[in-house]
Amino acid sequence: IQQINKTAQQLCEYLAVQSWVDEIYYPTISCDALYQKGLKSGGGGAGLFSIVLKSPEKNSPQFYDALQLTKGPSLGTNFTLCCPYTMLAHYDELEWVASIGVSPYLIRVSVGLESLSTLIARFDAAAENINQESYRE
């Protein structure tokens, strides 16, 4: 668990500064002060995070398809999984989900025991498949 926490934290920190990433949802990066206050000291942010890309309606399908991770809605394995969470969990409620600010293009990732460098390489390779003009400022 400690290795998964550490890798997830470092991966989220890396992804948070990439030009093609719009939002990272991970406890130690994107949560409010009240949530931060309740975190257990030394407990880590866990191995689960979500990512929304810039221009997600264009970029998420290509990115997800190119991302060389096992695809599935599970979590807690020793290998990293990803899934288009909102589409899987709320497909019949997409209008409602959008009304509360959740992107239908959110990709959820459950980090496993792969090395940080392996995961960064896979995310970077998938990012090469998206339209760079759509996220440049």
Language-model segments: what does each one mean?
Residues 3-73, 77-79, 92-98, 135-137:
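Conserved small-domain helix->loop->beta segment predominantly found in fold-type I
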